Amino acid sequence: RTNYFQNVPTNALDLALWMESDRMGHLLGVVDQEKLDEQRGVVQNEKRQGENQPYGKAFTAISESAFPKGHPYSWTTIGSMDDLDAASLEDVQDWFKTYYGPNNAVLALAGDIDLETAKIKVAKYFADIPSGPPLVKPEKWIAKRSEEKREIMFDDVPQARIYKIWNVPERDTEEAAHFDLASSVLVGGKNSPLYKELVYEQQIATSVSSFYYDREIAGMFFIVADVVAGVNPAKVEAAMDDVMTNFIKRGPNPKLLKAENEINKTFEVEEIITSIKKNYSFCWYQ
């Protein structure tokens, strides 16, 4: 998914629609080999910068390890250097024609405009852009595992870091909401189970985090801990497992659960306050 947005006064709406329709309908006319090589270099530098940061190579290894070969999530979005080097002008043109048509886009307008005026203006600027080929929505592929898989990486980092990851259902499911809430309860504050046990009581980790990585055909549930220097990572992992076992067996602390539910409700209300956030939320759920 690529997001484009413009925040303009009403009298500049036509200009914004014209610019976006020009991008969708006529960009290929100015993409030549020189521009492709220039942008390829930009992306490659972005990849190097990311990988040269502490723990920057971890997610590539996680993607390859968590999903089987052939799964769309078994490689990172930015791709490998070999993939970037191999991308041709024809590849770029074919990809653009396939995915950047109006049949694969959602356009939302929010603000001082009525529905009929919006329809007229959008038709004026976008109606002549040809649709791309019909697209088949990918089927969900959670890549369930029947065994534990372990990987050890060595890199120039300030301290050891433990990633525990589970392949779980995709976004916009009941399970996704549960995992999102669970991550907040597990690490949401100094009284949360993982933080309290690892950082405060045992003092074997300097930080601990958890999050649900929501994607279209599969999700991932992460728990991450940074190990205190000199502490055996196995001790930290064992403590993480104990907390998770108790959490699964007994469920969340009712007070923590109530507090996190209230925080999530507030966040959801804040998400629809501004026009941009309204547009984003609308497009996301289309």
Regions found by a protein language model. Give the residues of each.
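His/Glu-based metal-binding/catalytic segments typifying zinc-dependent metallopeptidases
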Residues: 48, 53, 64, 134-191, ...
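An aromatic/glycine/proline-enriched structural segment found at the starts
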Residues: 27-28, 69, 102, 106-170, ...
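Conserved, carboxylate-rich catalytic/transport cores that coordinate ions
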Residues: 96
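M16 family metallopeptidases and their MPP-like homologs
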Residues: 1-24, 55-82, 104-110, 159-170, ...
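Peptidyl-prolyl cis-trans isomerase
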Residues: 28-31, 35-36, 87
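Extracytoplasmic/secreted cell-surface and envelope-processing proteins
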Residues: 115-119, 174, 232-234
